[in-house]
């Protein structure tokens, strides 16, 4: 492990310390390493050809204009990416779905974009993790 020195303005340092405390990091170095890993993972996931895993979560109105069937159709069109899906009924109108995905990160991003762009889908979020060699 290498020791490096960085310079941060006061506001950014205060924000880092606040984040570190909220997340329970023992020191700034652990927080910065985690933030850097996240940024590098996100960067890696934007390239076609990179293999990895992802979690796609979203809330949708299940009775909105055949939305449920459109989402299922999209899932079947990308069946090779899907590892598992969890479906939760939030209330009478809304459902939460969480899909675990595996494959080419460009294809995963395309699938997530297709789902999240559907009218009636809210709070869509894709968390990607590149496959470690």
From Swiss-Prot:
Residues at which Ni(2+) binds: 76, 87, 89, 95
SUPFAM superfamilies associated with the record: ACT-like, Ribbon-helix-helix
Cofactor note: Binds 1 nickel ion per subunit.
GO molecular function annotations of the record: DNA-binding transcription factor activity; nickel cation binding; sequence-specific DNA binding
Superkingdom of the source species: Bacteria
Keywords: DNA-binding, Metal-binding, Nickel, Repressor, Transcription, Transcription regulation
Xref: InterPro entries: Acetolactate_synth/TF_NikR_C, ACT-like_dom_sf, Arc_rbn_hlx_hlx, CopG, CopG/NikR_regulator, Ni_resp_reg_NikR, Nickel_NikR_proteobac, Ribbon_hlx_hlx
Listed GO biological process terms: response to nickel cation
Iron-sulfur among keywords: no
Keyword DNA-binding: yes
Cofactor(s), by name: Ni(2+)
Pfam families cross-referenced by the UniProt entry: NikR_C, RHH_1
NCBIfam families, per database record: nikR, PRK02967.1, PRK04460.1
Assigned protein family: Belongs to the transcriptional regulatory CopG/NikR family.
Subunit structure: Homotetramer.
Role description: Transcriptional repressor of the nikABCDE operon. Is active in the presence of excessive concentrations of intracellular nickel.
Annotated protein name in UniProt: Nickel-responsive regulator
The organism of origin for this protein: Citrobacter koseri (strain ATCC BAA-895 / CDC 4225-83 / SGSC4696)
Gene designation: nikR
């Amino acid at each position: 492990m290498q020791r490096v020195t960085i310079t941060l303005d006061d506001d950014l340092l205060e924000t880092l310390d606040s984040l570190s405390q909220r997340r329970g990091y023992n020191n700034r170095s652990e927080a910065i390493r985690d933030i850097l890993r996240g940024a590098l993972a996100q960067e890696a996931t934007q390239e076609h050809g990179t293999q990895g895993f992802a979690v796609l979560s979203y809330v949708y109105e299940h009775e909105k204009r055949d939305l449920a069937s459109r989402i299922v159709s999209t899932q079947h069109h990308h069946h090779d990416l899907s590892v598992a899906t969890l479906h939760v009924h939030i209330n009478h109108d809304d459902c939460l779905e969480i899909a675990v995905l595996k494959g080419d990160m460009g294809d995963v991003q395309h699938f997530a974009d297709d789902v999240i762009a559907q009218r009636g889908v809210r709070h869509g979020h894709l968390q990607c993790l590149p496959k470690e060699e």
